[in-house]
Amino acid sequence: MRLLPLASVTLLSVLCAQAFAAKLEDTAPYPKAEDGFTRQVIHLPKQQHEDRYKVEILAGKTLTVDCNLQRLGGKLLEKNLEGWGYPYYRLDQVSGPISTRMACPDGKTREDFVPVTGDGFVLRYNSKLPIVIYAPKDVEVRYRLWSAADKTENARQE
């Protein structure tokens, strides 16, 4: 029974150490978010062969939509942390939504995540640095990981 408290303390120490190591300020002095913006951070786990992975940034808003395909517009711009050379990203403006114009006979609507589409939303995978994104306060940032298959195919000359 004496091992249980020791195990709990050890587990708590490990979790606290991981949480502390994941703090953005421990990596570099990234600027605070400006008024009207939030600073959102993604810490990626280490992968073997990180060159085979990509990170897709899904910035967007939850909106009321119908049967049509909805999209927002914007560009995710890469900036450089002066003196450090580390990248961070900024989504300055979000336009839209734009929508297809199909008739929706049932007239039903639902709440759904509508992503921003545009340039700069697919990033290189690098677990050594956090992905830091500055986005307008009303924009939610999600992400998806993409990985390449081990097998490659040859192109044919024609």
From Swiss-Prot:
The record marks R101, M102 as: Reactive bond. One of its GO terms (cellular component) is periplasmic space. It holds the Pfam family Ecotin. It comes from the Bacteria. The keyword Cytoplasm does not apply. Its main location: periplasm. Transmembrane segments: none annotated. Keywords: Disulfide bond, Periplasm, Protease inhibitor, Serine protease inhibitor, Signal. Disulfide bonds join C67-C104. Residues 1-21 form the signal peptide. General inhibitor of family S1 serine proteases. Homodimer. This is Ecotin. It comes from Pseudomonas fluorescens (strain ATCC BAA-477 / NRRL B-23932 / Pf-5).
